[in-house]
């Protein structure tokens, strides 16, 4: 008599995480393998001002950004961070090219970064790694998951 007990085959699943790219005001967006996507992301300008929906919370960072070369309706996403003079992140969020639309079809948008100490903000930087890819990890799916993943999103205290 042949008896089989549960499946114990090892699928050989491996997750890898991309290295975080060099942050800048203008960056070439890259995929999880570090290859350029043909898209440039740029912080056009920024200023400190109260958010119109929560003016009592004081100044926040209001910034404008642009994606050149992005596809209509879908495309990359990058982390935007307000930084101090030492390039330490004071507040970050992911901005999506698909949410950036301006006149004449250009991919421009604006967003807000809430920071604890707005007086310390020296600039807004973008991290070139495309954050729009959300493939399954080995932990989520040992058979079909794994492979390269974008770096962990930037957060407060990260040196960029």
Locate predicted features.
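Short, solvent-exposed, Trp/other aromatic-anchored flexible loops in extracytoplasmic proteins
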Residues: 84-146
């Amino acid at each position: 008599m042949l008896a089989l007990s549960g499946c114990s085959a090892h699928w050989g699943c491996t997750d890898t995480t991309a290295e975080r790219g060099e942050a800048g005001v203008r960056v070439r967006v890259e995929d999880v393998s570090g290859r350029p996507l043909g898209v440039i992301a740029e912080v056009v300008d920024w200023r400190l001002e109260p958010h119109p929906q929560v003016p009592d919370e004081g100044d926040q960072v209001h910034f404008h950004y642009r994606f050149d070369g992005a596809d209509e309706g879908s495309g990359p996403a990058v982390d935007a961070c307000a930084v101090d003079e030492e390039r330490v992140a004071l507040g970050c969020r992911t901005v999506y090219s698909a949410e950036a639309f301006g006149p004449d079809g250009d991919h421009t948008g604006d967003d807000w970064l809430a920071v604890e100490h707005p007086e310390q903000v020296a600039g807004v930087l973008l991290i070139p790694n495309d954050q729009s890819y959300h493939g399954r990890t080995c932990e989520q799916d040992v058979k079909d998951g794994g492979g390269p993943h974008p770096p962990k999103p930037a957060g407060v205290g990260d040196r960029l």
